[in-house]
Amino acid sequence: AASDVYKRQVLTPQIELYGKTCGIFGLGAIGFAFAKMAQGFGMRVISYSRHKKTDPKYDFIEQVDFHTFLKESDVISIHAPLTPSTENTFDAEAFAKMKDGVILINTARGGLIVEEALADALRSGKVYGAGLDVMRDEPPKKDNPLFHLNNTSITAHIAWLTRASRLRAIDIAIENFKAYLNGTPTSVIN
């Protein structure tokens, strides 16, 4: 019944974000935007990224090595592309190095996480909870162990799916094409 859901939500221990450490994995445009949001909640923001950012706009973010990133983050938000060097980054070894009770968010690519290792970390309480908008297999297999855990919220790769975001994507594509035709392409990755 709805009242049971409400009672369960009220009784679930809440976590204060203020003063906690938010770790951003991948400090591109989306990771940077998320970092600003975390800062707005009064969080200390650290990041691990392949390339050190030197622009002064990144000064509020502590750029750290991967070991420090895992050890100090209370919340980890993943924003990196899936490449041969990032695939399976979040495996059993990485989860073991994290703080107890860390919260994990992945809106990037499912292949960055070893899902069985995440399921084990969630069952043990090492990871307090996970919010996943992406999975290794999409659509995911029915027997995926993450589906059977109460401390996991999974959406079907729909974070971008609002009507407004689709219209904005069309506008961005048009502007990017115009810039390309003018010899000034945007979002170039070398």
Question: What do these predicted regions represent?
Answer:
Residues 31-32:
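N-terminal Rossmann-fold NAD(P) dinucleotide-binding loop
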Residues 11-13, 136-190:
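C-terminal helix-to-coil terminal segments
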Residues 27-28:
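Glycine-rich Rossmann-fold phosphate-binding loop(s) that bind the pyrophosphate
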Residues 46:
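Conserved beta-strand positions in the Rossmann-like core of class I SAM-dependent methyltransferases
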Residues 51-145:
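Rossmann-like adenosine-cofactor binding region
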Residues 35, 39, 122:
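Gly/Ala-rich phosphate-binding loop of Rossmann-like dinucleotide-binding domains
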Residues 1-6:
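Short, small-residue-biased leader/transition segments that mark boundaries at the very start
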